[in-house]
Amino acid sequence: MQCYTELLPPTGVTHSLALPFISESANNLVVARTSRLQIFSLLDVGPRPGGIEEQGVPKLVLEREYALPGTVTDLCRVKLLNTKSGGEAILLAFRNAKLALIEWDPGRYGICTISIHYYERDDSTSSPWVPDLSSCGSILSVDPSSRCAVFNFGIRNLAILPFHQPGDDLVMDDYGELDDERLGSHGLESGTDCDMTKESIAHRAPYSSSFVLPLAALDPSILHPISLAFLYEYREPTFGILYSQVATSNALLHERKDVVFYTVFTLDLEQRASTTLLSVSRLPSDLFKVVALPPPVGGALLIGSNELVHVDQAGKTNAVGVNEFSRQVSSFSMTDQSDLALRLEGCIVERLSETNGDLLLVPTTGEIVLVKFRLDGRSVSGISVHPIPPHAGGDIVKSAASSSAFLGDKRVFLGSEDADSILLGWSVPSSGTKKPRPQARHTEEDSGGFSDEDQSEDDVYEDDLYATVPEVVVDGRRPSAESFGSSLYNFREYDRLLNIGPLKDIAFGRSFTSLGGEENAGNDSGLELVASQGWDRSGGLAVMKRGLELQVLNSMRTDLASCVWTASVAHMEEAVSKTTTQAENRECHQYVVVSKATSAEREQSEVFRVEGQELRPFRAPEFNPNEDVTIDIGTLIGKNRVVQILRSEVRSYDGDLGLAQIYPVWDEDTSEERMAISSSLVDPYVAILRDDSTLLLLQADDSGDLDEVELNEQIANSKWTSCCLYFDKTGIFSSISATSDELAQNSMTLFLMTQDCRLFIYRLPDQKLLAIIEGVDCLPPVLSSEPPKRSTTREVLTEIVVADLGDSWSSFPYLIIRSRHDDLAVYRPFISITKSVGEPHADLNFLKETNLVLPRITSGVEDQSSTEEVIKSVPLRIVSNISGFSAIFRPGVSPGFIVRTSTSSPHFLGLKGGYAQSLSKFQTSECGEGFILLDSKVLCFILLCLTYCILSFHTGCHSYYPWTIQQIPIGEQVDHLAYSSSSGMYVIGTSHRTEFKLPEDDELHPEWRNEMTSFFPEVQRSSLKVVSPKTWTVIDSPAEHVMAVKNMSLEISENTHERKDMIVVGTAFARGEDIASRGCVYVFEVIKVVPDPKRPEMDRKLRLVGKEPVKGAVTALSEIGGQGFLIVAQGQKCIVRGLKEDGSLLPVAFMDVQCHVSVVKELKGTGMCIIADAVKGLWFAGYSEEPYKMSLFAKDLDYLEVLAADFLPDGNKLFILVADSDCNLHVLQYDPEDPKSSNGDRLLSRSKFHTGNFISTLTLLPRTSVSSEQMISDVDAMDVDIKIPRHQMLITSQNGSVGLVTCVSEESYRRLSALQSQLTNTIEHPCGLNPRAFRAVESDGTAGRGMLDGKLLFQWLDMSKQRKVEIASRVGANEWEIKADFEAISGEGLGYL
């Protein structure tokens, strides 16, 4: 019984779409990452302070994201009659023939599903000779006028979904009894369109009933559809389809040359009929895509592997060949630009502007190419292609693009599955001279110039695009196409989205970052996960860690310390203004104040002054001489005053910490003694909450003196449990009732929470009540002014904080709520416009963000009580402006930061190193920006915070949800990776593209010598490199195709039986499908050499120890047995070999295998191994040493196409996890005692689980006990033998996702399985999808208990307190048991990472 948990979601962008989605005037980018939907807004921001940008640039800001229980296959925009936001809707296509229509709901600040349509049960897909839907691609296209959408699925089926538009007859009818019956029974006339909506019949108006037609109904000759797209400028819905009557084939090119047709059909939605408008025949057979072009060009662009063909509305064609094969594969008339040598397979085409017809083309190599059309009025007379040179931004994209979106205003987004997705901008070189149209030089009748009439007609569509230096003819020659492209466009990068996919191989290595000072400098911080990521030129390494590592610069011991603060104060003689940030950083003294508890009621304040990286004791006799307990320390009046808030008084100091003012905390009206328990300080206000739950509000004047602010009756007479001040920069709180003139003056807000957990928001200084938020302690998904229903169960809250989260580009206020058990709830404020009888009313609501972080459970009752005391005394700490980032620090047993970037939602980033008692911002000119930390050992560390590199892509490091990721660019594709434990180095197998030429000395093929082509095919050429984890630089590069790289402990001497860690490399010589492959096994040792004095890190090199050429390609390697031998998969044999002293590899045992061995792995030290074949399933075998032999134990009879596999022991049970080629995960078990196993000859299928990702690696890892298991074992150590799983499986995928399979106990499985059923049936799923159907795999019924879905289970945490308790009671468990189960499956077992 296992559970699959997605630790990191997919990062590769598969689809993108630009549209006004959130509002009618918004500019949004919607991105699909396999099973993840993200909605971005485009924000124009100013240049970063201190940056190199001279002007503002657009940035992507994430609005919402959703984990979808389905795989997105396409996105299209639809303009409906009436949407809730006023913007457009999105039509999403999913795998297995599903469509979902969604819109933006401003009242929920999220998406709303209008309808769901599925065609997977259509009768047309049940034919025995039709492939399964999961094996077929699909095409979705929407009419530019949003009159209908067509969905091609199951190869030859076409679903048509009409939409209602103004003036259509569909708006007036189609609401009869037949429609109601169809909606109720989910049946259709020609299909199975299931329209599941929650709204009334009036809200079903956007669409009409869909119908399914075979493509043969349009034209009987459409037997092999290739691509289709709706066209622009037609009165009726009209689309063009690319198809052939016989299947295209490169191998049969001499018989099937130019067999492709392009036909344009117009649809009659009322009669469900079509009319053929035009048809173009004998098109090149390598055409694969139709791109509809908007005005002024119009028509369609047909893209082939070697050419581009344009077909206008009258059927006129223009074509251009971009490599020399265009003349060989087709007889179609086209312009010759074969000197470009472009490969167009899988390229992406996007328009560059709305005013001209220029197109951006990105081939799989990543280079940027410009496609231009020669226009004669509205007619296209020619096409030309121009590569953009590197100096004009032509090399910004490093790998293939998967999608594109035109965002307007000279901005284009390029999504990629193989590299980071990039937001591009382009500009035109400035000049005052018009440039004549240059496309004419590519036509035969070009005379070198144009008439004035032609020029004026072109200017209608060009505007000032061609306002560049005129073309100069030198010696009768014109500039090249490349220089021409650069003279028109300069491309630059505005923003990018992180992608760590595809992850091809992983290795675990030692981390060199130390978290201790001199006392524990020798202790490393555990392991780090290094993965090979990227494709082609974007290849590199990704270093991943579960938490934030901080580099210790200095440390000191300070006994009995309870808290630490820092204060940056300006010199007394210098006036530092509030707006002069640079002056503050240069002319300020940095003080560190450490509070030491001398008794239960007394604390001594020890003051240090920062000098360089050292803390020097500073004598401040007037600083807390009464040893009162310090609540908080901060600065006011532009860092001219230091304010120390004590329990009994507030003390104000000057720049040298001389006493300036004392303000008592007691109540002056009643003269009763009062004590401060919490405070909030934002210049110029100080809010103090006293022990009688009353509020004291102080304000500093221009001189720095504090005066009490007289509170209104409501604030003064109420009882408060928490207070927080916030300077409203965005105006979201003030905009509720303030005018535009008031926003600049009244931007300070005061948040107060009552004893019944009602949140009051006041504006300062007029103390106007802005909003009242009800039921905060219920923690519902949306906080509003309306009290929650059925709120019998509530959470005990201890603190609320309102602070900015974000980076220098985009920061936004968030409400953070902390509970008694140290749980955190993060809410984002938004304005909801409600339309009542009168004017529309704006209400302030708070949306709950997804939270997947559980606090650690401390062991023992005493530890829990002590932890609660720490939580009460050390509140959440607001950390602002750390390299432009704003975050919130949570102290305690689960320390970490709540962080957010402009392209990610708020998430918790744990701090590695265990317990942290207090933290404060620290900054000097010598060490830069960092923190000072107080840990459990009462050690005060000066830390260089790596947040500046972890949260900024400019340095190659990122924070990605609970993990930190550092990207190391290599510049080549990294296919294999191994960690050399003896040297501490990483050995990587890289590859790069190189041209393949036929050998001219081949005696069997003398005709190869006469080959005249200059456009050679490309193959991968491999090399080995050694990378240092200290500097992440390549230090050795010794070149055959690397198939496997492993680190093994091999026996290097037959006499002494000495063993040493070696790097074993398997290679293959593949020269074509008609020539047998050869291979070789290399054994290397990473040795130390004398480095170059200028580069001391270059002190390692690979030394060849052994080499063994073999027959057949070496496709997999593994260590086996206990004698230091290795097993080699070579061709159709698996041979166990031992390293001899002469460097040869002696075979000792073998086994014949199937076709192509993709995986060989041993259960370490047992001799049991799995041998997985790429097409013939998996074998379970064993190796014995006395005598040497290999034996077959069991087989997988399903003949799986194995991509990755590994063992997963669970107690006395042995499971094998197998990843197939259809994104499924199979759990097999070897159980010879089961009668179904035929005495152990068969591997039993226990469960099948659809991950939605193409899995690249499965790695068996040890599992550390989590805090809940440690607590149970401590309590029940003498009573019960607790069985804790010792193994887990780490999964990486091609799209960048990282998952974990964890074994769970019988009791936990029943509890979580029941919870999963409840969540599946009760919560609302995005796009109306069914998570149970998404994870299910069709089988013959032999599978047992299904694998649990951790991503679905964690949605229980986002529910309100009442719903959590209700669902937990239905499951028969309490909250603590469910949270303990969540902790076990959430990845906390990776304690060493």
UniProtKB/Swiss-Prot annotation:
Keyword Nucleus assigned: yes
Natural source organism: Aspergillus oryzae (strain ATCC 42149 / RIB 40)
Protein's name in the database: Protein cft1
Record bears the keyword NADP: no
Principal location listed in the UniProt entry: nucleus
Similarity annotation: Belongs to the CFT1 family.
Region called Disordered, residue ranges: 427-458
GO biological process: mRNA processing
Lineage: Eukaryota, Fungi, Dikarya, Ascomycota, Pezizomycotina
Record's keyword terms, sorted: mRNA processing, Nucleus, RNA-binding
GO terms assigned for molecular function: RNA binding
Subcellular compartments: Nucleus
GO cellular-component term (any): nucleus
Pfam families: Beta-prop_RSE1_1st, CPSF_A
Entry function: RNA-binding component of the cleavage and polyadenylation factor (CPF) complex, which plays a key role in polyadenylation-dependent pre-mRNA 3'-end formation and cooperates with cleavage factors including the CFIA complex and NAB4/CFIB. Involved in poly(A) site recognition. May be involved in coupling transcription termination and mRNA 3'-end formation.
PANTHER family attached to this UniProt entry: DNA REPAIR/RNA PROCESSING CPSF FAMILY
Signal peptide: none
